[in-house]
Swiss-Prot record:
It comes from Chloroherpeton thalassium (strain ATCC 35110 / GB-78). The lineage of its organism: Bacteria, Pseudomonadati, Chlorobiota, Chlorobiia, Chlorobiales. The keyword Transmembrane does not apply. NADP(+) binds at residues 189-194. This is Glutamyl-tRNA reductase. PANTHER family: GLUTAMYL-TRNA REDUCTASE.
Amino acid sequence: MNLIAVGVNHNTAPIELREKISLTDSMARSLLTELIDSKLASEALVLSTCNRTELYVVPAMPEVTANYLKDYLIAHKGVRKEVTRDHFFNYFACGAARHFYNVACAIDSLILGEVQIIGQVKTAYNRAVEMKTVGPILNKMCHTGFGLANRVRSKTKLTAGAVSVSYAAVELTQKIYSDVSTKNILLVGAGDTAKLAAKNLLDKRVRDFYITNRTYEKAELLAQELGTGKILPLEEMTERLHEFDIVVTAVGGNDHIIKKEHVAAAMQKRHRDPILILDLGLPRNVAPEVGQVNNVFLKDIDDLKMIIDSNLEKRRAEIPKVKHFIQKELIEYARWYFSLEVKPTIVDLQEKFFEIKALELARIKNKVSAEEYERMEQLSDRIIKKLLHFPITTLKQQTADTTDPVSFIRNIFDLKEQEEEFPGLTFPINLKEQNNN
């Protein structure tokens, strides 16, 4: 199989080097154009994300090797001093296809089972289609990968459970409150962690959502970005803490922004109605003693990490099932590819049989009636199709043992196993050598 994959990912290089070799959309398009226009490749695909830059190529010249492609990508980015061949992986033929399937199914991801990767793979494919740099080999590989990714999502639990702090916070919230949408929620903070937590909570159709932050303007900007949320001045937070069923904190600084006395006072106003406080800050935003107040559920990053670790372990348990799916599709892909190689032989074989048929029928054409000749022609066609059916099927599936001519012929014509004429009899002497003495 004439297919090469080279690239840099989180397994082969640190982030500072991955950044050097990464490609923007315009860079990827330029690289694809160069490879095809210079006749170096007949097909090419570029996948570049924050954790990987990978190049899949069907070479058009013998000199286009894995090392050639590594050097080409390094030169294209102008990073010879920083990045070397040692920072790359390389795969060939079915190994390249297997790696692509591992990527598409998210078992090669930094975060096992991430759902974003398949969208990134499809973007890479659509770009190559638009640039007309994919042909039958990469096209088949990509569509097989898309089908595998769908099957993995529907038939396994590889993508189940939270594996990020912000999503784990939501998962924990749902374990405590069956219907999060009816709860009043306060988000303390306006940074990246707070934003992710807010987005995940809003996905649960939360209606009453407040944002507070040390900088009022940042809280307003986050509310605008989210398209929802009421702003609560930070100085009013402790007085109104009792209004909220869920409080999520994610702010910087070394001081505890919520203390035991604040929560104790809030719980009296809530008449002991439970409150969940999720502290996503590092250092912690909430005093640890808050957890001592009755009916207060205080969870911090360590608690969420336990959920994440448990979910990751469950995901790892799904890997053998995913690999089984991949192996089955890889076999089918290899068979399909081999069928492309044998197609000219199959065409020649069919033409040869029909050529013999035509010659033999021509000899008797003037000796039989037109009706008889037509019936003989139809009969000959049916015989040829039946004679060739199994050989052609066998060739496409590459099941014949081509190292042994006798076994090969018996296999492609589906002949029954031969019984040994003289069972147990062997010839230890090489007859050819004996005749030369």
